[in-house]
Each structure stands twice: as structure tokens, then as C-alpha cells.
Amino acid sequence: MSEAASESRTNATEYTVSEISGALKRTVEDVFGNVRVRGEISGYRGPHSSGHAYFALKDDRARLDAVVWKGTMSRLKFRPEEGMEVIATGKLTTYPGKSNYQIVIDNLEPAGAGALMALLEERKRRLQAEGLFDAGRKRRLPFMPRTIGVVTSPTGSVIRDIIHRIKDRFPLHVLVWPVRVQGDTASAEVTNAVTGFNALAWDGSIQRPDLLIVARGGGSLEDLWGFNDEALARAVAASGIPVISAVGHETDWTLIDLVADVRAPTPTGAAEIAVPVKADLEATLASLGARLKAAVLRNFERKRQAARAAARALPSPDQLLALPRRRLDEATSRLGRGLSVSVDRKRARLQGQRLTPATLSRRINEARTLTGRDLARAQAAFFAIVRERRARFARTATRLSPAPIARRQKLQADTLAALARRQDRVISLRLERLRGQLSQAERLLTTLSHKAVLARGFALVKNADGAVIKQAADVVSGMALTLEFADGTADAVATSGAARPKPAAKPSTKAKEPGNQGSLF
């Protein structure tokens, strides 16, 4: 039996690690060459700079690594996201370098509209909680924009419909930012377009739009999924330029419809909302002009009738001018007579004052005299001012000379030194008085202290609690006592509880015999 087992092991095919890994790879790829796997996206990383995306598909019991190559990513109808439930179509393969397996995805689609709707509702709740859908933050559209920016695909019927509708209603300048409106990069391109239009300067070479239209034709939920991107919704909400959302048909809705300032049912409807009808405006202006002209004419006719009525109430011009004409004639006559009289008077005065050389010489001398007197007065006043200013400068120079300043400094220094000496004397006297008071207090304390009494040979008796015993009646036989002397304390025990009665008076001055002396305790 043992020999058979040994022979069986010897006859088993021997593989190298590379051979067995290759055999497993071929087996897996042959058996699972085309599979559909349903799971939740986990650990989504991508697309990387290479264009590939790596993640895992998982359920509640297992996990499967997955990869989407660059070419497949560009064909996807939606952008994969973390937590999204999808159905992946592809083939299983192994990676011999790490002995693991993965699915290479050829197609990826959401696991039904329910999964996308659940994700969309979750985003909607989050953005609504932040107030991005509030009507109070939405801006009014300009009535007549000069430039409109359109974010859409450069090909297709959407851009043609918008431009055609604007041209029919009110031709103006249209800027088109071409983007993809479907696929994995659609949301990023539309986001960049919205932020790019907002980054344009008002006085730049490219005219900044007054209004933005983000448009796309109709489609399924998966086709419109790029317009449900959270980053795009936030960019539209933060736009400084009013935005009209025109994505899909009237029954479709996306996140940017909720954050945009106005939602149009269709791209054509967005163009109709964006600009008024030029013919209607012209008709309105013509009507208003006619009404204004009629109002002006009516007002003019009223004023003319009022002027005519006032003219009829006024007297005739001849009656109004008769009195002023008479006054003018009288004034003219008086003026002529007055001029004649004045000329005659001036002529007579001139004849009476002949300009002889003597007269001219006298007048010149008088003028010289007056001029000399005025000049002398001016010189005297000038020199007086100069003397006063010199005296003022001299007084100022005297006050600012070094000698008075030095004297003032010396006086202040002497005063300060005298004050310092007085302060020292006051402090010394104060200290001496305080020392005397301290000595008196010390002597009084010594006099009143029981230490002085103890120093004269007395003792202070205390019980065990430290209380002073003042009477013999307070002593009990056997009581523990403490005797305090001037140089220390001693413990003692009372041998009797009553003291001897004190004699009323001494019978004689004879000293007692030593044997008759009573006990202190």
C-alpha cells in the first residue's frame, strides 16, 4: 500500500510556479471569458493619469477586484462613483505576480434606474440641506443681455435650435463653450465651462456673458447622469452669472435644474426665456411713442388754449405801451436839456481856468510837496517797525542766552538739594521717634508679661489640658500638673486635694520651725 502511494506521487505531473499560474490563468479565462457581475463599487480610484480606473465589486460576502481600461472608460455612458450598484460585463483573469484574480470590464451599467435614483435622491437631500435650492438665492435674469454663453455640444440639434431661436427673436452675440454632454468626462467638462465663463473679465478681449444657458437634448437617466454631478451643481450654484438650465425634455429633471436660477423645459424654451422678441419690443416702443406724442400734443393744445384765454383778458398792446411811451418821451427831452446845460457849465469852467505855465508849475510843486510828505510818513513808519522788531529780537536773544539758562539750572539744583537735605532730616527724626516708641512698648510688654513674675521665683501651675489653675480648690488629689518656671517646666502630681487654711494673722515674727512647714500641694 505504501509502495503504491509512493509510486502515485512519483507519477504526478510536476509544475513550476509559472506553469501552474499560467495554467490557472488559461483555465479561468476559458471558463469565465464573458461574465456579468452585479455588485457595489468600492474603493473607486480613477480615472488615473493613464486613463485607467481601478476599484472592486463587492456584496455582503465577497469582493472582486476590477479594472476598466482607458478605451472602455471613454465609452461609458455614466461616471462610476463610490457606493453605486452596477452590473459589470467582462472576463475574469488572474495576475500571476500576486496569485489573485480580477475582472477586466468591457461594459459597465447601473444596476437599474432604482440605484441611480437612490443616489440622486441622497445628493438632492444633501444639497437641499445646504440651502442651494432656496428661491431666495436665485437671481433675476437680465431683460436684454448683450452676450449669452451657451454650454453644450458643438454638434447636434440643440445648439442649432438655440442659435436659430435667438436669431429669430433678438439677434445678439452668442459664445459657445463646446463640451461633451454624455459620458464619463461630461460633468467635468460642463463644470469647467461654467467656471471658465465666470473667470472671464468684464473688460477682457473675450466679452463676458451676461447670461449662461446649459443645454442638452433628452435621454434616459443614464444619458443625463453627468448633469447630476455634485461638483457641477455646486459650480452652477456659485456662478456669478445667472444660469438657465435646459437639460432634457420637460419631464426630465437633474440636479442643475434645481440649483439654476431658471429651469427651461427645452433648449428652445431656454432661448425664448433668455431674450425677448425684437418685433414685440419694436411694436411696444412704437405704441408707447404714439401715446407719448398724443399726450404731448394734448398738453400743448391745452396750453395754447389757456394762453389764448389769457390774451383775451389782457388790454391791447397800445394801451399797455401808452404810458411807458409818454414817460420815455419826457425822459428823452429832459436828457437833452440836461446835456446842453452840463456842456455849457463845463465849457465856462474851462475858459475860467487857463492852463498857463505858472499854473502847471504850481500844481507840480503842490504834487511834489504832497508826495514828499507821504514818503516821509512811510519811511518813519517803516523805521519804527524795524526798531520794534529789533527790540523784540534782542529781548528774545537775552532770554535764550546761556547765562540765564545756567543760572536757572543752578537755582533749581540748589532747591532740589535743599529739599533732599530736609527730607533726610525728617526721615531721621521720624525713625528716631519710632525707635523710642518701640522701646517703650518693649518695656511695657516685659512689665506685663508673666515671664517677669516667674523670674522673681514664682511658678505657674497648669492642669493636663494646659489650663492655668488659679485656686487650691481646683486641685484634686492625684491630678497631673505642670509647673512652669522661668527657665522651663516640670511635671508633678498633687498628693492632697485641699490646701491648708490661711491664718488670719501672724502671732509673732518668730520663724517657723522647719518641721511645721506645710506642703505646697
Curated annotation (Swiss-Prot):
Top EC category: hydrolase
Name of protein: Exodeoxyribonuclease 7 large subunit
Highest taxon of source: Bacteria
Membership in a protein family: Belongs to the XseA family.
Catalytic activity: Exonucleolytic cleavage in either 5'- to 3'- or 3'- to 5'-direction to yield nucleoside 5'-phosphates
Taxonomic path: Bacteria, Pseudomonadati, Pseudomonadota, Alphaproteobacteria, Hyphomicrobiales
Subcellular location: Cytoplasm
Biological process per Gene Ontology, one example term: DNA catabolic process
